[in-house]
A protein has these predicted regions:
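Transmembrane alpha-helices and adjacent helix-loop boundaries
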Residues: 2-283
Length: 283
């Protein structure tokens, strides 16, 4: 009897249940220790303080890039998802082609192709149209294709839009067809049925993958460093590369970069889980 009690997964002490060591989330403990060590070096080492100060300004640019890119990706994903479930052959074919091509190409290649092939071509085309129509305001709009930040946003949003298209499609198809039929029987059009009945329910279903993709985009925003940026406005990874190359402090630089990304990812994970619990579909 005594041996059975000792093998239980919890121990009783002072009338309270305490987890045994094997039930403690040790990965959190290890991360906390590593984070505290790096924070200690940052607060006590002049070299770490200089590195961290230089990199910290890249956090804002990284968050801006992620948020703006994700908002565009949500739009592209919704359009692609609706196209994927469309019964119109042309629309369905175009949406499927977009999804399959983008998902079949590495995101880094997508970013480079958009930044150095599509964006310059689009900028030149808009300028020619503006000249032909004598419309200077159109030429001013071409800055979207010339600005490094906007090219990064377009690359991330188009790349992640393909993945979000499948998320939207799966979420919409998870809703019972009876919901659509009931809405149509009440006199709603197909678009109204999607907008007021199907999509509100689908969004609650797809919240977890949407949140995961947002965090994934935060980390993949580091790929934008491959297309270059204005130094004072560089995102975190590019600032790390610049600082490491000029000071030769690779150890301090990449420890700080990793810590900053980890802090942002864990912080967003907490927010995403809170939103999921608040808006999740009851089981």
């Amino acid at each position: 009897m005594t041996s059975q009690v000792e093998r239980q997964s919890t121990a009783i002490k002072g009338g309270r249940l305490l987890p045994l060591p094997r039930n403690i989330p040790w990965w959190i403990v290890i991360l906390a220790i590593c984070g505290l060590l790096i924070l200690y070096f940052i607060t006590t080492s002049t070299s770490y303080q200089e590195t961290f100060t230089f990199l910290a300004s890249g956090v804002i640019r990284t968050l801006q890039l992620t948020v703006v890119g994700y908002l565009f990706a949500l739009v592209f994903g919704l359009i692609g998802g609706l196209g994927r479930i469309s019964k119109n052959t042309v629309i369905n074919t175009v949406a499927t082609l977009y999804v399959e091509v983008i998902r079949g190409v590495p995101l880094l290649v997508v970013l480079i192709y958009i930044a150095f092939v599509l964006a310059p071509a689009a900028s030149s085309l808009v300028s020619q149209i503006a000249t032909a129509l004598n419309a200077p305001f159109l030429d001013n709009m071409a800055f979207v294709f010339r600005d490094d930040f906007m090219r990064g946003v377009l690359g991330l949003s188009i790349g992640y839009g393909a993945y979000l298209s499948e998320v939207y499609r799966a979420g919409i198809e998870s809703i019972s067809r009876g919901q659509m039929e009931a809405a149509r029987s009440l006199g709603m059009s197909y678009g109204q049925s999607l907008r007021y009945v199907v999509l509100p329910q689908a969004v609650r279903v797809i919240l977890p993958p949407l949140g995961n993709d947002f965090i994934a985009m935060l980390k993949d925003s580091s790929l934008v460093s491959a297309i270059g940026a204005v130094p004072l406005e560089a995102e975190l990874t590019l600032r790390g590369r610049m600082y490491s190359a000029t000071t030769y402090k690779a150890f301090e630089t990449w420890n700080s970069v990793a810590l900053l990304y980890l802090m942002m990812s864990l912080g967003l994970s907490v927010i995403v889980r809170y939103v999921e619990r608040r808006w999740s579909v009851p089981k």
